[in-house]
UniProtKB/Swiss-Prot annotation:
Gene assigned in the entry: Tas2r143
Organism domain of life: Eukaryota
InterPro entries per record: TAS2R
Organism: Rattus norvegicus (Rat)
Keyword field contains Transmembrane: yes
Name the record gives this protein: Taste receptor type 2 member 143
């Protein structure tokens, strides 16, 4: 029987996940109706809709995976974990594309590459979404391969019928999945980080340039920079929390019945929840639909 703190954190995790599923479901419905009405979506809304759909699935998979692992359905949980890996990689790449889209559209740098991207980025979005799916699929294949190897190691060490890991299989899980995370997730994180840095410099240059003209704090371009930076600040917070949680999880053994495991889960999915709130508030269509509902 889990301890009282563990039960409390389990309930909090479940409530956060359900709230986030409702939130992302709202985004899917609003943008889905927009797509049905116009038979098309603006490029940025395509990315946001894809993010909302992926996050909706991620929370559902996280609930199912933790439920299965709690009852020692380890092989089933490992299969669901492969789906989690696919969705999570997809989300990381979609977040990187959204950051790049904001950077290209809003930044005021005069580099020829940025000029070219500013005119082409909207047409490139469908291809970028396809790249995200491909990277997610590749990540799932790597994860499935790791599960197969680890299961063979568990069987060879004589562990059957439960979730017990031998020393060799546990070390393999730690190093294999940490290497997998670095390989598959560092690139979108790097792209995301570079985009944020460019946006920050662009905002600083714009504010300094316009300060002499004193347009006031409601200058449209300054507002656009500020709104994008608010969204991307939450994005990068989610990234940092996620990677810290990944390091913690890769250096510990079975922690399902420890409240620290659930604290880590709450941190990860609360970050996603807060990130989705910023997406709703920064998107005119979603913000308008939210005001009409409430």
């Amino acid at each position: 029987m889990p301890s009282t703190p563990t039960l409390i954190f389990i309930v909090i995790f479940f409530l956060v996940s359900v709230a986030s599923m409702l939130q992302n479901g709202f985004m899917i419905i609003v943008l889905g109706r927009e797509w049905m009405r116009n038979r098309a979506l603006p490029a940025v809304d395509m990315i946001v809709a894809s993010l909302a759909s992926s996050r909706f699935c991620l929370h559902g998979i996280a609930i199912l995976n933790n439920f299965l692992a709690s009852f020692d359905f380890c092989y089933q949980a490992n299969f669901v974990g492969i789906l989690w890996d696919f969705i999570n990689t997809l989300i990381l790449w979609l977040t990187a594309w959204l950051a790049i889209f904001y950077c290209v559209k809003i930044s005021s740098f005069s580099h020829p590459v940025l000029f070219w991207l500013k005119w082409r980025i909207s047409q490139l979005v469908p291809r970028l979404l396809l790249v995200s799916l491909i990277m997610g699929g590749l990540s799932a294949i790597i994860s499935a391969t790791g599960n197969i190897i680890a299961n063979q190691m568990i069987i060879s060490q004589g562990f059957h019928g439960n979730c017990t890991f031998g020393h060799m299989s546990l070390d393999f899980y730690r190093y294999y999945y940490l290497s997998h995370a670095v390989l598959m997730w560092f690139t979108p994180f790097f792209l995301f980080l570079v985009s944020i840095i460019f946006l920050m410099f662009s905002l600083y240059r714009h504010v300094e340039k316009m300060r002499g003209h004193r347009p006031g704090p409601w200058d449209p371009r300054t507002q656009a920079h500020t709104m994008a930076l608010k969204s991307l600040t939450v994005f990068i917070t989610f990234y940092i929390l996620f990677f810290l949680a990944l390091i913690i999880s890769s250096t510990k053994s079975k922690t399902m019945h420890s409240y620290w495991y659930w604290v880590r889960e709450i941190i990860i999915y609360t970050g996603i929840f807060l990130n989705s709130i910023i997406l709703v508030l920064s998107n005119p269509k979603l913000r308008k639909a939210l005001k009409m509902r409430f």
